[in-house]
Regions:
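Alpha-helical structural signal in soluble globular domains
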Residues: 79, 83, 125, 129, ...
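Radical SAM [4Fe-4S] cluster-binding motif and immediate context
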Residues: 191-347, 352-354, 358-367
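Structural detector of well-ordered beta-strand residues that form the stable sheet scaffold
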Residues: 134, 155, 178-179, 282-284, ...
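Acidic, low-complexity intrinsically disordered segments
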Residues: 25-248, 252
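Structural recognition of alpha->loop->beta junctions
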Residues: 146-165, 298-308, 364-379
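Short, hinge-like loop/turn segments at secondary-structure boundaries
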Residues: 66, 104-105, 150-154, 172-174, ...
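Flexible glycine/acidic-rich beta-alpha junction loops that bind and position SAM and/or redox cofactors
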Residues: 54-58, 143-146, 265, 317-322, ...
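Radical SAM enzyme core and accessory elements
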Residues: 1-49, 85-88, 100, 169, ...
Length: 519
């Protein structure tokens, strides 16, 4: 038992964090100030797409930022006309400031809440030097008036539809201040992302895939509940996904769908298509996917080695307040066992600071995670994103503490909790990460299959206890070379495991019938 007051008995030592992980690269480090506004040569038909820098949380693993690339900007790049040269730049790969010699004619910048300030800094820097700047992303949708002064045009909605239109208008000097598109188009018509633009060695895998768009839930705290964001559930043909997986020639893929399991009939079909590849993958699903244990078996046979599940809370009252459709929390443990019985690891996501959370929530959550041997856990302080139901509720109650968007990163308390102080919420958040990333907790959650323990420990220590080294792996392009041997070993074990699984009876949910793949 963990004492309810343990998180508050002593202060958690602050983890060391390299300056490169908290501070964006200087934009004018090599130029005298007098030259900052001098005219620059602007190359026609040259576009740069930028994912801005954001400060990393010292409590969490830095590795989560480079597991797989985001797809939005390289998906837009795939729609760029052939006579345009396009470049992709992710500031979080620690390669310095974005390209500026020659100055691109067009700069597209994605804007999210926690790096809006950096996005505006980049936008202003490029505009004064002659580039046309297009801002898009969720923050543009939720706070367009805040973004407009920093852009030549705003892209509100599906950028895959908007990007070619914007470039055409730039060519004809008819650029409009705003462009809008819905997410209701047939998703299967989108071209595959342009992965050739990626710095491949800086990611665990470059094969981030999207098979579906949207989610059957609309939780009040989720960014999908943002005003104006209507994202009907859309699915790509399974064979399209298979061809994209094969084309990138990687052994491991991460599905970055909001919820791959919203349509179980579709997921059954997708698993049937993926199974012949003999590759491995992970995905985000909701825990109710275990309503159909035969689907869990098919996922394992298709190569699923891990799932990211938003448990959010162990309180039914909190989940009801959030309008999340989910099974009773008392049934979570049984459902986790079903996943484990089929060799599927669980990364549980938990939100801390709901209105029914008291100061014992940290100890109770940590204890439950250890009892149920979740291989990994991710934590977030409840954060009211602008233009969501949660933000409106807290604003009406006078509980919003400030609007420093940089701190709306789910690692800081930006509102007044009901049953603790903001400082206690932040201390509990730091404690639970400290607890779950400790040697003792990692060992408590080891697989029951002793043969899987060495690989589990190697991955756990690299991911959870190597923050001192992650910035070096990222900066020097060593993420993929270091991870790939572990991924290959995981794939080898899982291929052997699912051969045994395929030969077994299809009886579902009997603990011990299936040996954990340990991946």
């Amino acid at each position: 038992m963990i004492a309810p007051d343990e998180p508050f008995l002593r202060s958690i030592p602050k983890r060391w964090i390299p300056r490169e992980m908290t501070t964006a690269p200087a934009l004018d480090s090599s130029e005298p100030k007098a030259a900052a506004v001098e005219p620059h040569y602007v190359e026609p038909h040259y576009a740069v797409l930028i994912n801005p820098f954001y400060s990393k949380d010292a409590n969490a693993s830095f590795g989560k930022h480079v597991l797989t690339p985001t797809l939005a900007l390289i998906s837009f790049a795939a729609t760029t006309p052939a006579h345009w040269r396009v470049e992709y730049w992710d500031e979080n790969l620690l390669q310095g400031r974005p390209p500026f010699r020659p100055m691109p004619q067009v700069v597209g910048i994605t804007v999210h809440l926690t790096f809006a300030r950096r996005a505006f800094e980049l936008a202003d820097w490029y505009r004064v030097r002659g580039s046309k700047v297009i801002l898009g992303g969720l923050h543009v949708l939720s706070c367009p008036e805040e973004c407009a002064p920093h852009a030549d045009a705003l892209a509100l909605g599906d950028g895959v539809q908007l990007w070619p239109r914007i470039l055409r208008d730039i060519e004809t000097n008819s650029l409009q201040p705003r462009y809008g598109a819905t997410y209701e188009n047939d998703y299967c018509d989108d071209p595959p992302p342009r992965r050739s633009l990626l710095r491949r060695r800086s990611f665990l895998t470059t094969t981030s895939l999207i098979a579906t768009r949207g989610c059957h839930n609309r939780c009040g705290f989720c960014y999908l509940a943002t005003d104006g964001l209507r994202m009907p559930y859309r699915m790509r043909h399974p064979q399209q996904v298979v061809e994209e997986f094969k084309a990138d020639r990687q052994p491991y893929a991460v599905f970055i769908d909001n919820n791959l399991g919203s349509r179980r009939d579709y997921l059954h079909s997708l698993c049937a298509a993926l199974r012949p590849l003999n590759k491995i993958w992970s995905a985000a699903v909701t825990i109710d996917v275990t309503d159909d244990p035969s689907l869990i078996r098919n996922m394992a046979l298709a190569g699923c080695t891990g799932v990211f599940i938003g448990f959010e809370s162990l309180s039914d009252d909190n989940l009801a307040d959030s309008h999340k459709k989910t099974p009773k929390t008392s049934d979570y443990a049984r459902r986790v066992r079903i996943l484990h019985d089929y060799g599927i690891q669980v990364n549980g996501s938990f939100v801390l600071g709901f209105d029914h959370d008291r100061k014992d929530v940290f100890a109770r959550t940590a204890e439950w995670i250890e009892e149920n041997r979740l291989e990994c856990a991710t934590f977030h302080i409840l954060t009211p994103y602008p233009a969501t139901p949660l933000f409106r509720q807290m604003e009406a109650q006078g509980r919003i503490l400030h609007r420093d968007w940089n701190l709306y990163d789910t690692g800081h308390a930006v509102f007044q909790p009901q049953h603790m102080t903001p400082q206690e919420l932040e201390q509990g958040y730091a404690w639970i990460y400290h607890r779950l990333f400790s040697h003792a907790s990692i060992w408590r959650r080891r697989p029951e299959d002793w043969q899987a323990i060495p690989l589990y420990l190697a991955m756990s220590y690299l991911y959870k206890r190597s923050n001192r080294f992650w910035h070096l792996l990222i900066k020097h392009g060593l993420v993929n070379p270091v991870w790939k041997p572990l991924v290959k070993m995981t794939r080898w074990r899982h291929v052997r495991y699912r051969r045994r699984l395929a030969q077994r009876e299809t009886t579902i949910g009997a603990p011990g019938q299936v040996v954990s793949a340990g991946v």
